[in-house]
């Protein structure tokens, strides 16, 4: 990312942490989607550096995956004076607030794959071994990581879509959680009275803790 910043002549203090908002957009509404996210970044006083269209090779995709492929973008952002821990906390709060606003706008189909200064999600409707064939970033020697989480299994009780692909933001999981509905109900019941010395008043902004419209694996990821 710093190499791209230099190419684009965008100034950035290298002592400040960089974050990446990884998104799937409806190809018909890319500009509106970016505008919504940029406005929310301003509300949170998060410095936006640039948007990059993630380089991909759609030729490796099957017919269904190619026809349903979203526009894949990454928003590159920067910490200001926050510590790395506080910046990550701010990004979580930003994402939860943004997702609530997205849910209120019917015509915008936006999925936030990840929003973090520590991890970035690359996923889609293809096998694990095709990941680097589709995402050119993962063949770039400038990209380095301490670990990677891969997920090979396709959904069995829901139709496969790009946003349902794994890994999620924290984990990859095979699902089939038999107690998912009761787990969700207990979390929802406790959510009303939940308090936190870490989140303080901001705890209201990260509710609901669990999105009941997604898969059981996705709900587990919400909880983590």
Regions found by a protein language model. Give the residues of each.
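Conserved short alpha-helical segments that host acidic/polar catalytic motifs at enzyme active sites
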Residues: 1-224
């Amino acid at each position: 990312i710093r190499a791209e910043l230099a190419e684009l002549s965008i100034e950035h203090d290298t002592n400040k942490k960089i974050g990446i908002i990884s998104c799937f957009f409806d190809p018909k509404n890319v500009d509106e989607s970016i505008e919504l996210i940029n406005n929310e970044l301003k509300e949170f006083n998060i410095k936006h550096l640039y948007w990059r269209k993630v380089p991909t090779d759609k030729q490796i995709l099957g017919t269904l995956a190619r026809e349903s492929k979203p526009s894949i973008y990454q928003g590159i952002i920067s910490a200001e004076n926050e510590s790395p821990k506080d910046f990550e906390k701010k990004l979580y709060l930003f994402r939860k607030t943004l997702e609530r606003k997205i849910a209120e706008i019917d015509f915008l189909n936006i999925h936030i794959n990840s929003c973090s200064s520590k991890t970035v999600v690359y996923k889609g409707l293809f096998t694990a071994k095709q990941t680097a064939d589709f995402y050119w970033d993962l063949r770039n020697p400038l990209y380095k990581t301490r670990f990677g989480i891969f997920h090979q299994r396709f959904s069995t009780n829901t139709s496969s879509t790009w946003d349902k692909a794994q890994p999620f933001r924290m984990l990859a999981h095979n699902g089939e959680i038999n107690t998912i509905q009761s787990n969700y109900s207990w979390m929802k019941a406790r959510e009303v009275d939940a308090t936190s010395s870490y989140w303080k008043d901001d705890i209201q902004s990260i509710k609901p803790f669990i999105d009941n419209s997604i898969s059981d694996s996705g709900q587990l990821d919400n909880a983590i």
